[in-house]
Design a protein with these regions (language model features):
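A short, aliphatic-rich alpha-helical micro-motif
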Residues: 40-41, 59-62, 144, 193-195
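Rossmann-like adenosine-cofactor binding region
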Residues: 54-59, 171, 177-217
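Glycine-rich Rossmann-fold phosphate-binding loop(s) that bind the pyrophosphate
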Residues: 154-155
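N-terminal Rossmann-fold NAD(P) dinucleotide-binding loop
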Residues: 158-159
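N-terminal glycine-/charge-rich "phosphate-binding" loop or analogous flexible N-terminal tail
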Residues: 1-44, 169-173
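Phosphate-binding beta-alpha-beta segment of Rossmann-like dinucleotide-binding domains, i.e.
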Residues: 86, 94-148
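Short beta->alpha connector loops at strand-helix junctions that form conserved
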Residues: 30, 71-72, 88-99, 176
């Protein structure tokens, strides 16, 4: 069995990528251009990718391919319907980034609520030192405590974000799927979540149904 990794450079060199069990031939390319994909995957039973796009036109040229394994959670770069029709399994790495994404979310949220970028610049360029009051009042800053956080997509990451948000003293609303009646008292109507939330966290996979889920309207 042969496995080909098309974009090894999307993972840090500090991360060891072990050869999967049962794989006799293993090839890892640092990066792969669109016009190199078919040639490199032609003899492969397994394709390992992170960001490389595999659409129907490509998959139809790979009769030996049995499995596409992503080194990430999102699978929107793979034509899953075409893969299914051709008998190719598609797998991802579920749950590996729950804590990391949760921490990153709150890092970005705190930075935005506290206008960290602006105030850091004000200290760096001397604005704060020259003010004379030893304080700045613009732009305004906001606390997380007491704010309402709407979560769209209540999987592992959504639930982890909920837990941390509650520790900050935030009110958390779980959004039911758009157009559906809330399945339990834990969930809130989708439109009500949008209307009542100070902050919204999108944690759902990118699919045709979720694309532009939150739009100008």
């Amino acid at each position: 069995m042969k496995a080909v990794f098309l974009d090894r450079n999307t993972l840090s060199e500090r991360i060891d990528v072990d050869i999967p069990k049962g794989v006799v031939q293993w090839v890892a390319f640092q990066k792969t251009a669109p016009d190199e994909i078919v040639q490199r995957l032609k003899p492969a039973d397994i394709a390992i990718v992170n960001k490389v796009k595999l659409d129907e036109s490509i998959l139809r040229q790979l009769p030996n391919l049995k499995l596409i394994h992503l080194t990430a959670t999102g699978m929107d770069n793979i034509d899953k319907e075409a893969a299914k029709a051709l008998g190719i399994e598609v797998k991802n790495v579920a749950g590996y980034s729950t804590e990391s994404v949760t921490e990153h979310f709150f890092m970005m949220l705190l930075s935005a609520m506290r206008s960290l970028k602006t105030y850091h610049a004000n200290v760096s360029d001397g604005t704060w030192q020259k003010d004379g009051r030893f304080c700045l009042t613009e732009p305004p800053v906001f606390e997380l405590h007491g704010k309402t956080l709407g979560i769209i997509g209540v999987g592992n990451i959504g639930k982890a974000i909920s837990k941390v948000a509650e520790a900050f003293g935030m009110k958390v609303l779980w959004a039911e799927r758009q157009g559906r009646v809330p399945r339990s008292k834990e969930y809130t109507d989708f439109d009500k979540v949008l209307a009542q939330s100070d902050i919204i966290s999108l944690n759902c996979p990118l699919t045709p149904e979720t694309k532009h889920l939150v739009n100008e309207e």
